Amino acid sequence: MEIHLESQEQEMKYQSQIWNQICGTVDTSVLRCAIQLGIFDAIHNSGKPMITLTELSSIVSSPSSSSIEPCNLYRLVRYLSQMDLISIGECLNEATVSLTGTSKLLLRNQEKSLIDWVLAISCEMMVVVWHELSSSVSTPADEPPIFQKVHGKNALELAGEFPEWNDLINNAMTSDTSVTKPALIQGCGKILNGVTSLIDVGGGHGATMAYIVEAFPHIKGAVIDLPHVVEAAPERPGVEFISGDIFKSISNADAVLLKYVLHNWEDTECVNLLKRCKEAVPADKGKVIIMDLVIDDDDNSILTQAKLSLDLTVMNHGGGRERTKEDWRNLIEMSGFSRHEIIPISAMPSIIVAYP
């Protein structure tokens, strides 16, 4: 049966929406290109609130070392403007460009930057797996994720073999930590009261733990991760690094931190890991602190859309899942904890505290 649309105006709205979704990969490609060219940094490092397009074209450089074509640069900047990442103006009949509040999260050498997340998510090794999403939808939870079928090994195994991939992953996690740091420290204030030792399970290069021991110097901090991760980790004051398999052994501490770890696994693996964490903390006053996404299926905000995008990413690339409040309740109860609380913070993840 033919569907009759309400009006020409409504039909154009529907067509525009579909065309934007058809070309959805353009957003990621443009974002990656802008970072590779150094567009945001060029504007910021100029020391001026805005620069002309001519100035920008003389500053930025392509990875191939070839010169920039001003007309093509303008077309790229025009699209970045539609993404609210660049503001286009005019001065003395010449186009000018300036940063927006959003693009300030895409600068290098800043306290808050998501550049490394962009580069990791948009790299060829990640992008090629999206072509197999339909296969991922039909893959049972007990089978390897599509990433492993495409590349022959899972992401962690590849990280152990290829230093550049290992750096890409860990730099992305450090990048996320830089953005969530203020909310994390604020949200953990009461939670860490009375905690003298904390171990970050799967804590990568230790950026999160470094922030915590700096904010709470009374805490003895440690990070446990795979040997190839620990070997590449930089020295951090007040942070001890431990090589090991988090599914086999976790050192004892007053509290355990799991930041963006459980979303990489299905429930069975998560329960096993949470039980290990429960054994590592005191039964009377121990805490297992989880930083992970909490999805609200009834919320249609841009934040929820971002969370759902990450849910499909971990499904397709890692074989894990993002979880709702009910999912977290069931998971924590299955792991034998007596109670838990979910604390929203001003960041993508929430803080979930499980008590033995």
From Swiss-Prot:
Q: What organism is the protein native to?
A: Papaver somniferum (Opium poppy)
Q: Where does S-adenosyl-L-methionine bind?
A: M173, T177, G202, D225, D245, I246, K259
What is the name of this protein? Scoulerine-9-O-methyltransferase 2
The role this protein plays is: Methyltransferase involved in the biosynthesis of the benzylisoquinoline alkaloid noscapine. Catalyzes the conversion of (S)-scoulerine to (S)-tetrahydrocolumbamine. The heterodimers SOMT2-SOMT3 and SOMT2-6OMT convert 3-O-acetyl-4'-O-demethylpapaveroxine to 3-O-acetylpapaveroxine, where SOMT2 is the catalytic subunit.
Pfam families in the cross-refs: Dimerisation, Methyltransf_2
One biological process GO term for this chain?
Answer: methylation
Keyword annotations of the record: Alkaloid metabolism, Methyltransferase, S-adenosyl-L-methionine, Transferase
Subunit architecture: Homodimer. Forms heterodimers with SOMT3 and 6OMT. The heterodimers SOMT2-SOMT3 and SOMT2-6OMT possess 3-O-acetyl-4'-O-demethylpapaveroxine 4'-O-methyltransferase activity, where SOMT2 is the catalytic subunit. Homodimer does not possess 3-O-acetyl-4'-O-demethylpapaveroxine 4'-O-methyltransferase activity.
Keyword field contains Methyltransferase: yes
